[in-house]
Amino acid sequence: MADADQERSGSPEVDGNTLVAMSLARAGVDRMFGVVGIPVTSLANRAVALGVRFIAFHNEQSAGYAASAYGYLTGRPGVLLTVSGPGCVHGLAGLSNAAANAWPMVLISGSSDQSFIGRGDFQELDQIAAVKPFSKFSAKATDISRIPASVFSVIDWAVAGRPGGTYLDLPSDVLHQTVSESEAERLIIQAENGRNKELIEKPRINYSEIQKAVELLRKAQRPLIVFGKGAAYARAENGLRKLVESTGIPFLPTPMGKGLLSDTHELAATAARSLAIGKCDVALVVGARLNWLMHFGEPPKWSKDVKFILVDVCKEEIDLRKPSLGIVGDAKDVVEKLHKEIKDDPFCLGKTHPWVEAIKNKVKENVAKMEVQLAKEVVPFNFLTPMKIIRDAILGVGSPAPILVSEGANTMDVGRSVLVQTEPRTRLDAGTWGTMGVGLGYCIAAAVASPDRLVVAVEGDSGFGFSAMEVETLARYQLPVVVIVFNNGGVYGGDRRNPDEITGPYKKDPAPTSFVPGAAYHVLIEAFGGKGYLAGTPDELKSALAESFSARKPTVINVTIDPYAGAESGRLQHKN
């Protein structure tokens, strides 16, 4: 019927691939990540022709992690394109990561010809069922006429309420159907006009809850403001700064909340975390969940009498945690309303308030202890010596500050304590799920989202290995990314087994946690025209950082670490 319409109209024909690309471009998509192949290669090419930059990866997992991080960094859904069947399955890594972190992302996969479903078609899979645990909303365009509405729906649902992943299924037969160019435009306009605007509207804030929150903070003796990546996603930094500085309340960021207010701010309680959460009597938690990262908001880490004020865009999250007060709303909007309410009747703890002094004194004490350790130049490297050198180099870049990507066990844990974030959305790490393998995908997303910033990845050798082949992607697109690999020869280090542990018929095999000693990771990127460095001393590392930061070209710095440095499972030894 579509072909007959085209014949009558006389206008050029548009196939399903082109209509998907047109709809994506009209919906504001300007970047896509993915791996092409049957049946979506033409779709990628048509999108590029319409002005959408397509970043082609080697593996859908890394591409999916890139799409999820791009959604977080830009506030617009990151789009992942995959082939059918196994390509869609590989894409679930990124989709599930987006769901866990509440980041907007759209997974688009080709699928089997509908006439062959159930007969063992090429890469056949019930992909709608496969994505269900991780997708807020899924659509299948069963006819070319349904493509525009399906595209707009998955885009809108990705950002609606609590952001997350959505899925669009494109059967191969639909991608080859055609309509006239005029009909394609009519379908797109119809889909645009039919968008549910209420879906993407921010929730209305209950003003009485704002008043109650201010009263709780006003009466508190030891208040604390906690904010996370939800506040970063909402661009709440200006409101948070005004709120903190007008009230004098100390603040504690979650790992990816770091930088919303500078780690060097006088009211930052990061270095006094245990004291801050253990003694506060009222905690305003903005865009952060009381999950394992926050010890579930329970004793003994938190006081049994603490009163939580939870600010979250998702009512279900507040209902789950049962705080003293919950405010459903966009983090930026809520914080600004809190500040306005306080501004009309101000209060401030002041620099000499006992609670503020206690936090500052503990911060000073703990920072001094850390600096003593950082001042030691230990060779062979432990984790602290190279981390201090990296910290100083990153701070030396100035503004705009580099985006830091951090993954690993000990590498990420030590980096969280040592590396300093001074600007919003400049730290990406394993996140809510503690996902390993995100590093190179995150680097690529950061470089594409913020081309004016240097991207610096500080990776354990295990974390790097998940996505190491994507250094070719860095080189192919000439992205300003410096990857620093902490090479200690294994998942947590080299072979640390006692002799009495090495038994059984395969005792000559390497330990399950160990890699090839002295692996030349820096040579990998040289195969693709990038620059590699080997650094085993402070001077070698300083020189490599200075040169690579100045060049802003794809680089891998292989930092050799004592295989016995660090602890198994990092700070989560009790879980292993």
Where does each model-flagged region fall?
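Phosphate/pyrophosphate-binding active-site segments
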Residues: 2-11, 145, 192-196, 215, ...
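Active-site diphosphate/adenylate-binding microenvironment
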Residues: 20, 27, 35-38, 43-45, ...
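Generic enzyme active-site microenvironment
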Residues: 167, 310, 405, 458-459
